[in-house]
Amino acid sequence: GGGPVGIGDVQGVEVSGNAGKLKKRKQVKIRIKMKMAQPEMDDGELDAKKVGNRIRRRKRAFQACYERELKRSSDLAGKVLLEVTVGSNGRVNSVEILENDLNASVGNCVRSKMRSIRFPKPDGGDEAIFTYPFVFSKG
């Protein structure tokens, strides 16, 4: 039977040589350029500068979308153009991909990150629509 284990029953395991050492994988630093533009306000009253600032604060999240796919396709570069509809409460109601020179994974990831941003409430109480270009390339 499986009775209690006394301390005398436990034996140490000896690790010798390199068994306990993990090999460090070299990480290659890739410089990435991401052009940050001002949003093009299409409809409604929303401060373009405030919108641009909210998007810039999430720059790393957008870059991560590109970096992940760059590992699979080293020559990946291009533009993702989004049309964003912001509701009267400042939440994103919809994000459409108007143009995508990259691949579907980057486009969908960028759209998803944009959808999660809270924007200022549009003046006048209506929804606001703007377009925003993301241009990615290796630097």
Predicted segments, located by residue:
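Intrinsic-disorder/low-complexity signature in envelope-associated proteins
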Residues: 1-56, 139
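Short, positively biased Gly/Pro-containing turn/loop motifs at secondary-structure boundaries
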Residues: 44-49, 60, 64-76, 104-139
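A generic structural signal for short, solvent-exposed coil/turn residues
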Residues: 4-7, 22, 26, 74, ...
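Short tight loops/turns at secondary-structure junctions
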Residues: 14, 26-44, 62, 72-102, ...
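Generic structural detector for well-ordered beta-strands
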Residues: 54, 83-85, 96, 133-137
